[in-house]
């Protein structure tokens, strides 16, 4: 069994009790497959393990696999064999009619049944990789849940003398992983620039609107493959900061992602491209309470409503993949606490996250096989981290944020943000 069809093995006599023979077969046709010839007698029960070089077994019925001169035993197929979307249990049968010239018995493929597949597992290598690719696209979009500090630093004016308008730039990176039958492990870097306009300023609050554009570059690992990730995000922001320490940050974002992937399945390399689109509306509220010595605590709450969809695609193996669109709501409750002086601020933080939607459905089809996979990404995870900001001059501040998160199946291995904001 080496992936090459039409190979033969010839034996004089074969005492095959307890033995296993490995054969390659094209499941789409009943001709040209591997063939075993036993010119003399065959005794015992021999297992034939068939490995398909195609996506299904629907076309292989009737293919002759073994020809025997004098049959005194039997051939069976006791082990499952893997095709593109399902494992199959194969049934062999023998005949003495119209057999191969010079032989008395032919063993052929009589029938097959699909092994059961469910949301808990028993998916094929192809199915697990494709499920990881489409699910990983969703997790990539979900991981972009942002905060006001990560985007603008200390936005309350405590480290800036003039905060009317501002230009900001930042870099960020993240690594996340999720354990399931559709394994995904991703990391990326993202670079973003933005501009803020002062909309209104009173004695009690400041109201700023802004726009930002981000470019993402990363990679992902699946069960037996990898993906090259690219992303583009346009964001609109509406931020109100009150003098008493409260703030409300609203965001509207649209993202487009490209995933050029490749994986190994059915003994060969398979590649393709999976694109996806996501839209989100988010609201974040916080209330910084600070004492006269500079110590502060800031409870926060955030919700993000989102719509996500994977584009349909067909990989180089001929498997067509369609993802159903999904709506979700992401929630975060947390706090940061630290110390703030006229020159710098430092803090520690902790957060609780939950995905209240995340019901992701992928439909795969090839030849006559069709598989509908449901994966529940309704994860809960906790994060902790630290950060700080530094006033470089009257209008310029630098800031950073570090975070790590852990959940039952989803882990945020690390996350970092570094930014600069110039106010004028």
Task: Give residue ranges: language-model regions.
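Outer membrane beta-barrel translocator domains of Type V secretion systems
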Residues: 116-297, 402-403, 408-410
């Amino acid at each position: 069994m080496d992936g090459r069809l039409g190979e033969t093995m010839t034996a004089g006599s074969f005492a095959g009790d307890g033995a296993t023979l490995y054969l390659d077969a094209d499941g789409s046709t009943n001709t040209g497959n591997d063939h075993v010839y036993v010119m003399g007698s065959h005794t015992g029960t021999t297992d034939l393990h068939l490995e398909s070089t195609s996506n299904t077994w629907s076309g292989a019925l009737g293919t002759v696999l073994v020809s025997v001169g004098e049959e005194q035993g039997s051939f069976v197929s006791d082990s499952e064999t893997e095709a593109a979307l399902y494992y199959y249990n194969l049934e062999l049968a023998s005949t003495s009619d119209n057999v191969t010239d010079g032989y008395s018995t032919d063993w052929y493929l009589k029938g097959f049944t699909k092994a059961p597949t469910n949301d808990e597992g028993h998916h094929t290598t192809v199915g697990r990789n494709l499920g990881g690719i489409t699910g990983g696209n969703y997790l990539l979009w979900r991981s972009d849940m942002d905060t006001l500090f990560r985007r603008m630093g200390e936005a309350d004016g405590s480290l800036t003398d003039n905060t009317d308008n501002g230009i900001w730039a930042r870099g960020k990176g993240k690594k996340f992983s999720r354990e399931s039958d559709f394994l995904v492990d991703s990391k990326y870097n993202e670079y973003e620039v933005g501009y803020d306009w002062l909309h209104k300023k009173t004695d009690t609050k400041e109201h700023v609107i802004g726009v930002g554009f981000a470019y993402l570059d990363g990679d992902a690992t699946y069960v037996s493959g990898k993906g090259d990730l690219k992303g583009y995000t346009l964001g609109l922001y509406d931020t109100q900061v009150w003098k008493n320490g409260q703030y409300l940050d609203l965001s509207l974002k649209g993202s487009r992602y490209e995933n050029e992937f490749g994986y190994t399945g059915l003994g060969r390399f398979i590649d393709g491209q999976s694109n996806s689109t996501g839209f989100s509306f988010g609201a974040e509220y916080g209330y910084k309470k600070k004492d006269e010595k500079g110590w502060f605590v800031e409870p926060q709450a955030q919700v993000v409503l989102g719509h996500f969809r994977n584009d349909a695609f067909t990989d180089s193996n001929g498997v067509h993949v369609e993802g159903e669109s999904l709506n979700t709501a992401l929630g975060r409750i947390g706090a940061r606490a630290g110390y703030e002086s006229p020159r710098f601020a430092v803090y520690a933080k902790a957060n609780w996250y939950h995905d209240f939607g995340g019901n992701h459905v992928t439909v795969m089809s090839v030849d006559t096989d069709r598989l509908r996979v449901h994966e529940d990404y309704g994860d809960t995870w906790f994060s902790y981290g630290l950060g700080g900001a530094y006033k470089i001059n009257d209008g310029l501040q630098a800031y950073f944020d570090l975070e790590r998160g852990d959940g039952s199946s989803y882990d945020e291995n690390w996350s970092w943000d570094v930014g600069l904001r110039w106010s004028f």
